[in-house]
Regions:
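Residues that define the transmembrane beta-barrel architecture of outer-membrane proteins
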Residues: 2, 63-67, 120-124, 131, ...
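Outer membrane beta-barrel
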Residues: 2-52, 58-90
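Outer-envelope beta-barrel architecture signal
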Residues: 13-15, 76-80, 124, 133-137, ...
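Membrane-embedded beta-strand positions of outer-membrane beta-barrel proteins
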Residues: 17-19, 80-82, 128, 137-141, ...
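Outer-membrane beta-barrel translocator domains and adjoining extracellular loop/strand segments
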Residues: 30-36, 92-100, 149-157
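Extracellular loop and loop/strand-boundary signature of outer-membrane beta-barrel proteins
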Residues: 54-57, 110-114, 157-161
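Conserved small/polar residues in nucleotide/adenosyl-binding loops
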Residues: 188-194
Length: 197
């Protein structure tokens, strides 16, 4: 496993630029997020997730990152972000169909090596965020494709609504409004499988 990146930050109107391997998170993380977040918390104030934008990837994790180019420019209170990623992923492919991605990064056995870098994944999209001290609103859109390969999970009760197909589009809107006594955080998410089966 190898990883490399060039990351520039806070240069005039350029808030960030990532070339190579990077991570990202926008909104409340339903559309896209590589950040670690606990699944539950007893503290209500911690339920809101922070938007970290793009960050460099320097972990030994072979799966949880993007490879390509991404950047954010800032115009007054407006952040405009775009990203593109293309990389090979591990999966057990049978006649251009796979049931799931292999995400453990282990290649100890022959069957592990047979799944290594067998499919391609292309991801592109963007985020627009307008922020003031007591208010922000953001729109995130993301499209990903497995090219000629199709995901077809084994039919089980727990994956009844999992994505099936080779192309998918996700979009989400998030906002935060804060007053002296009340803080309101909300998120709306939409998924449009473009060729699900």
């Amino acid at each position: 496993f190898y990883s490399a990146h060039l990351f520039l930050k806070d240069i005039n109107w350029l808030k960030s630029l990532a070339i190579g391997d990077y991570k990202m998170s926008f909104g409340q993380g339903l559309v896209i997020s590589n950040d670690f977040s606990p699944s539950r918390t007893a503290v209500v104030a911690q339920a809101e997730r922070r938007t970290n934008g793009f960050r460099r990837h320097f972990s030994t994790n072979e799966q949880d990152f993007f490879r390509g180019v991404a950047g954010t420019i800032t115009i007054k209170n407006l952040d405009i972000s775009v990203f593109y990623s293309y990389r090979k992923m591990d999966a057990a492919v049978d006649s251009l169909t796979f049931t799931s991605l292999k995400t453990d990064g282990l290649h100890r056995l022959q069957r592990d090596w047979e799944k290594r870098k067998t499919i391609t994944m292309q991801v592109y999209g963007g985020n627009i965020r307008y922020a003031k001290p007591h208010f922000h609103v953001g729109l995130t859109a993301l499209s990903y494709s497995f090219g000629k390969f199709k995901m077809d999970p084994d039919p089980k009760p727990y994956n009844l609504f999992y994505f099936k197909g080779s192309n998918n589009f996700n979009m989400g809107v998030d906002y935060m409004l804060k007053t002296n006594r009340i803080k309101s955080v909300s998120y709306t998410h939409l998924t449009l499988p473009t060729n699900s089966r």
